[in-house]
Amino acid sequence: MKVPFLDLALQHRALREEALAALAATYDANRFCLGSDVEDFERSFASTLGYPNTLGMSSGTSPIHVASMIGGFGPRDEVIVPAFTFIASAWGASYVGARPVFADIEEGTYTLDPAALEAAITPRTKGLVVVHLFGLPARMDEIMAIARRHGLFVIEDCAQAVGARYKGTPVGLFGDAATFSFYPTKNLGGCGEGGAFVSRRPDIHERAKLIRVHGMVKRYHHGIVGGNFRMDGFQGAVLNVKLPHLAAWTARRRAIAGRYLAGIRLDGATLPSTPGHGESVYHQFTITHPRRDALRAHLEKRGVGTDLIYPVPLHLQECFAPLGQGKGSLPVSERVADSCVSLPIFPELTDAQVDSVIEAVNAFA
């Protein structure tokens, strides 16, 4: 049985008429930049997921940039970022002239290791980006205790974790600012680029709102340095159609993950851990195996799509070579990057397809 790694067309076909009607209404009303569609989404996102506020932004990278501006990071500052994540997690620090310092992750959870965080802190450390990778919350109690002790500005990168909770509390409500992505492949994806900024602190929310529109306090009067980080109306319209389905999609992802966890029995494979502190939303289901490339080739022959997320940790990316964190410096991130493979997990998968993936994985020898 052929099982694609991801098939967005299934979701979009099911929502086609409703989405096109919403887009037509936005088009006819000329609500192209921010506007009522975005405002409606901001209110719904906040109320549905338990946030005090939401600011729609132009991409998932935009709120990381905005949060780094608000954090006051500058050329003499260091910002700690986990080495195993998408590169946008480190761009905010880079954009404002700060130095990303990469820290190692835990095996199994793929999230920031609190001990590695503590070891990476220097007198120049001013901030921290915590990534709730693949939908699993990081260990926020330990991480926030370290951050408070050192006076760090904490950005929670929730791009892959919309709807996830840490000990019952939504991710994004622990740090100073939280960022979300609505890239089409995300658990809640738009039809193009989109993101959101959330903060439990009203002062940070208001500053981000100002930065989003060029720092403009009133028309053509600019109080602070800002940028163009606005969400467009079409994305707001599409996300308004999709948001009511998020809970059901998340439940289906969890059911698929549960089926994988119960059914995969492959010697040498490490499956995602399920620590008691976090309720994962399973943006990815990533396993590791010492013969990863051979396993992936085997699955391809069996018709199972896979992906490598992420094959090169950030400290070994060419653009960060001048920072000097070379090969061997972050062994867990390097080992995971060399051995990880992600299996299909999206809400439209059938049980028969999931069982076919399990059978194919278990048949590897």
Residues covered by each model-derived region:
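N-terminal "arm"/small-domain region of PLP-dependent enzymes with the aminotransferase-like
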Residues: 1-31, 36
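PLP-dependent aminotransferase class I/II
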Residues: 9, 21, 36-44, 48-54, ...
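Phosphate-binding glycine-rich loop
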Residues: 29-78, 92-96, 102-104, 169
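Hydrophobic residues in well-ordered beta-strands that form the structural core
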Residues: 75, 81, 102, 154-156, ...
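Conserved coil-to-alpha-helix start sites within the AMP-binding
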Residues: 85-90
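Helix C-cap/helix->beta junction micro-motif
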Residues: 96, 149-150, 302
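Short beta-strand->loop structural element characteristic of the AMP-binding/adenylate-forming
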Residues: 99-109, 307
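Active-site phosphate-binding strand-loop segment of PLP-dependent enzymes
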Residues: 108-190, 196-198, 342
